[in-house]
Amino acid sequence: MKKMNIAIDGPAGAGKSTVAKQVAQALSFLYIDTGAMYRALTYAAIEHHVSPDDEASLKSLLDSIEIKLVDEQSKTRVYVNNTDVTDQVRTEEVTKTVSLVSSHGQVRKEMVRQQRLLAEGTNCVLDGRDIGTYVLPNAELKFFLTATVEERARRRYEENIQKGFKQSLEQLIKDIASRDEFDSNRSFAPLRKAEDAIEIDTTSLSISEVTQTIIGYVKERV
């Protein structure tokens, strides 16, 4: 099979990461969790007391740390300077701050450079908000996952309960709607569907159903 890059984009809580992971596992492709890379930088910024508004300092911090992703069957482990921060990058504080950190042009350009290097010459699945439009505009297959704000908030609420995080469903609905607006209106590489992306509404679909739908499209291309 010739090299294939699969881009999966969509708003927060649409199921991108879980689906991307399962698609990659089913096809024996590399999974690159781009969101975890931004979360790792956000975590480091909080630890180093770097303001999420300070683009220059964030870029300097990014240049000074090593972010590593280790793909395991059950999850992607995230390391900053060889320290496992997999759980720390999923806290509420990081989640609330990551959109602002990732909105800066200098930060995104460097992250995208790293992501393109990882994807070069290999079969891989990447998920994020600008994979099909900016990171890998020439990806062989592009998907855009959507779901209602209420459904996405419900999924995040259940995830948080499993992780021991407490946040009301009503607040999550507000937070996700706010993040949608921010991500869609940022000046650099905003969240939007690529013209050639296949849109899948996941509101009433299971993870398995979405995964199988994407795999079906992949098999058509092989």
Curated annotation (Swiss-Prot):
Keyword ATP-binding: yes
MF terms (GO), sorted A to Z: ATP binding; CMP kinase activity; dCMP kinase activity
GO terms under cellular component: cytosol
Keywords associated with the record: ATP-binding, Cytoplasm, Kinase, Nucleotide-binding, Transferase
NCBIfam families per the UniProt record, alphabetical: cmk (TIGR00017)
HAMAP family: Cytidyl_kinase_type1
Name of the protein: Cytidylate kinase
Species annotation: Halalkalibacterium halodurans (strain ATCC BAA-125 / DSM 18197 / FERM 7344 / JCM 9153 / C-125)
Gene: cmk
